[in-house]
């Protein structure tokens, strides 16, 4: 949800609602402490779409932390968002995914998380009925092992049949 504050100044004066779908404890906190007419919090995409019409789905540093990223994305695409933005996501050039352990630097806090490095080719096959408008480097890297840095990438997709 922190992307909202990064882009809020660009949205000033526009009739935009930014809806965040998050884990339940973040939703509760957001609804109680941060929610405004422009910023809303929901537990599921369906809960959000029941209240708000959404033109854009933004997935920023999300998919790699989901237990089943392909299933989640397949389900999300059934809603035919006019545009889908994938950002800050690690992809491999391989035809298979890699499950890795992300270690948070101790200067931030001591933790480790399972994370996916998704096959870019396999991931792009999900976007049937969408056109890829752009691919971009997010200028962040993901460290694997001691030396290997994997760039975080992004993509912008447009639905060919959205109304």
Task: Enumerate the language-model features and the residues they cover.
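Short, solvent-exposed loop/turn segments at secondary-structure junctions
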Residues: 1-4, 25-26, 63-64, 90-92, ...
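A short SAM/SAH-binding and catalytic strip from SAM-dependent methyltransferases
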Residues: 54-70
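Conserved beta-strand signature within the Rossmann-like core of class I S-adenosyl-L-methionine
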Residues: 80-98
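Local beta-strand N-terminus motif with an aromatic residue
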Residues: 53-54, 81
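Short alpha-helix
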Residues: 110-138, 150, 154
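Class I (Rossmann-like) S-adenosyl-L-methionine-dependent methyltransferase catalytic domain
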Residues: 13-15, 35-37, 105-114, 147, ...
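A short, conserved alpha-helix within the catalytic core of class I
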Residues: 65-81, 86
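Class I SAM-dependent methyltransferase SAM/SAH-binding core
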Residues: 1-48
């Amino acid at each position: 949800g922190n992307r909202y504050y990064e882009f809020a100044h660009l949205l000033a004066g526009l009739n935009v609602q930014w809806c965040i779908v998050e884990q339940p404890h973040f939703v509760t906190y957001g609804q109680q402490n941060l929610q405004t007419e422009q910023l809303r919090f929901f537990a599921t995409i369906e809960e959000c779409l029941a209240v708000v019409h959404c033109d854009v789905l933004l997935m920023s540093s999300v998919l790699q932390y989901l237990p089943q990223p392909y299933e989640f994305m397949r389900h999300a695409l059934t809603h035919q968002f006019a545009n889908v933005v994938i950002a800050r996501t690690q992809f491999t050039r391989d035809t298979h995914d890699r499950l890795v352990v992300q270690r948070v630097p101790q200067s931030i806090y001591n933790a480790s998380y399972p994370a996916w490095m998704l096959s870019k080719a396999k991931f792009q096959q999900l976007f049937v009925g969408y056109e890829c408008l752009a691919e971009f480097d997010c200028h962040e890297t993901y460290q694997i092992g001691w030396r290997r840095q994997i760039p975080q990438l992004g993509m912008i997709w447009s639905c060919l049949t959205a109304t």
